[in-house]
């Protein structure tokens, strides 16, 4: 991944581990549909007692443990119904970028787990496992990243220089460039997974996208990132961070709408879409709590802010973000909801 983007690691109060319950709740909400998909759509040769499972974009836990255990339980149930093989063993590959906090991940592995665990550092936009070695893959809240921000967007002298720190949707030219990069990257992700999966293997994607017609700046996520951008501008104006650095600081994030995401998968032709389900999130939309919202976006974006502007710059930024969130709660309450999804893909 040319643009590294990792969550804040560790087990402290500002870590992703402590502020990822919202993401983890989607796996729980989708559990019944995941079980159904594994039971009816997984079509692999049950002649071996070894099943390989991988989580692409695992972060530092604990959600990845919930996701892989859900898959293991579902596959085990299918084995019991369709095979006489006993003593099934599971190998789980935890993949994320090399900057991910694998130490925390492995330190907090469930002690009673009944699987072998391996860490696989590397960009999931390319192949990270041998060909035809994987039976079931999962990726949760990871397919909104791009491998790099289009260079024109970061160039202050470019006609399409983006004044925002992300693709807010306010400029059609910026959206076009981000979407172009997103198509390339998701296509690469899918092609790599298709090479790794055995014939009839499944890839399950969970995450959030925009309903058709909804722009990023109309969503809670878009509003919060806009608050981060405006807060950075304020402290740059105070001379606390470098303005030139800020002008080129763009997040490698693109939130697709549902039609864009479906079209990219269909155009890739490596998979059959077995299910494209809207999931009712157990926690609904984000809570209207400034402390919660600020912390949630600090653990996801704060690491990138700190890497460029220092820890002090990051802390000052998020003090302002919290103030803006409190002030703008009435507008946040009117934000348009996103769509939480489960996509089940079978390798062709």
Swiss-Prot record:
Cofactor remark from the record: Binds 1 Mg(2+) ion per subunit.
Keywords per UniProt: Magnesium, Metal-binding, Methyltransferase, S-adenosyl-L-methionine, Transferase
pH sensitivity of activity: Optimum pH is 8-8.5.
SUPFAM superfamilies attached to this UniProt entry: S-adenosyl-L-methionine-dependent methyltransferases (SSF53335)
One MF annotation (Gene Ontology) recorded for this entry: farnesoic acid O-methyltransferase activity
Binding site for substrate: 16, 19-23, 141-145
Catalysis performed (reactions): (2E,6E)-farnesoate + S-adenosyl-L-methionine = methyl (2E,6E)-farnesoate + S-adenosyl-L-homocysteine; juvenile hormone III carboxylate + S-adenosyl-L-methionine = juvenile hormone III + S-adenosyl-L-homocysteine
Annotated tissue distribution: Mostly expressed in leaves and, at very low levels, in roots, stems, flowers and siliques.
Positions of S-adenosyl-L-methionine binding: 16, 57-58, 63, 94-97, 123-125, 140-142
Example GO biological process: response to herbivore
Family: Belongs to the methyltransferase superfamily. SABATH family.
Protein name as annotated: Farnesoic acid carboxyl-O-methyltransferase
Quaternary organization: Homodimer.
Swiss-Prot/TrEMBL induction comment: Induced in the presence of the herbivory P.xylostella larvae. Accumulates slighty in response to wounding and to several defense responses-inducing compounds including salicylic acid (SA), jasmonic acid (MeJA) and alamethicin (Ala), an antibiotic peptide of fungal origin.
Pathway the protein contributes to: Sesquiterpene biosynthesis
Recorded superkingdom: Eukaryota
Cofactor(s) annotated in UniProt: Mg(2+)
UniProt: Mg(2+) binding residues: 162, 247, 249
EC number: 2.1.1.325
Activity regulation: Activated by Mn(2+) ions. Strongly inhibited by Cu(2+), Zn(2+), Fe(3+) and Fe(2+) ions. Moderately inhibited by Na(+) and Ca(2+) ions. Rapidly degraded at temperatures above 40 degrees Celsius.
Signal peptide coordinates: none
Function description: May catalyze the production of the insect juvenile hormone methyl farnesoate (MeFA) to trigger defense against insect herbivory.
InterPro entries linked to this entry: MeTrfase_7 (IPR005299), MeTrfase_capping (IPR042086), SAM-dependent_MTases_sf (IPR029063)
């Amino acid at each position: 991944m040319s643009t590294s983007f990792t969550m804040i690691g560790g087990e402290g109060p500002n870590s992703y581990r402590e502020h990822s319950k919202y993401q983890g709740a989607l796996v729980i909400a989708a559990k019944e549909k995941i079980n159904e998909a594994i039971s009816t759509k997984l079509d692999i040769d049950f002649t071996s007692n070894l099943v390989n499972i991988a989580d692409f974009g695992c972060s530092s836990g604990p959600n990845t443990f919930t996701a892989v255990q859900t898959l293991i339980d579902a596959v085990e149930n299918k084995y019991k119904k369709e095979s006489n093989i006993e003593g099934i063993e599971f190998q789980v590959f935890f993949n994320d970028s090399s900057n991910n906090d694998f130490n925390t991940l492995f330190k907090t592995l469930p002690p009673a787990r009944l699987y072998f665990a391996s860490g696989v550092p590397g960009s999931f936009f390319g192949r990270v496992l041998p060909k035809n070695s994987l039976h079931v893959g999962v990726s949760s809240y990871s397919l909104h990243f791009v491998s790099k921000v289009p260079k024109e967007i970061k160039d202050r002298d470019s006609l399409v220089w983006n004044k925002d720190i992300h693709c807010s949707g306010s400029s059609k030219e910026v959206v076009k460039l981000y979407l172009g990069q997103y198509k390339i990257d998701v296509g690469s992700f899918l092609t790599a997974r298709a090479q790794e999966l055995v014939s009839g293997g499944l890839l399950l994607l969970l995450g959030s996208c925009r309903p058709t017609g909804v722009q990023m700046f109309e969503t809670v996520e878009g509003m919060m990132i806009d608050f981060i951008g405006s807060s950075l501008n304020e402290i740059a104006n105070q001379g606390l961070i470098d303005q030139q650095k800020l002008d080129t600081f763009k997040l490698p994030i693109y939130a697709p709408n549902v039609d864009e995401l479906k079209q990219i998968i269909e155009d890739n032709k490596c998979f059959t879409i077995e299910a494209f389900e809207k999931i009712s999130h157990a926690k609904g939309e984000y809570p209207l709590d400034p402390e919660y919202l600020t912390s949630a976006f600090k653990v996801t974006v704060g690491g990138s802010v700190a890497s460029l502007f220092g820890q002090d710059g990051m802390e000052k930024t998020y003090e302002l973000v919290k103030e803006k969130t409190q002030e703008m709660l009435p507008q946040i309450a009117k934000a348009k909801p996103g769509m939480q999804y489960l996509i089940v893909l079978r390798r062709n």
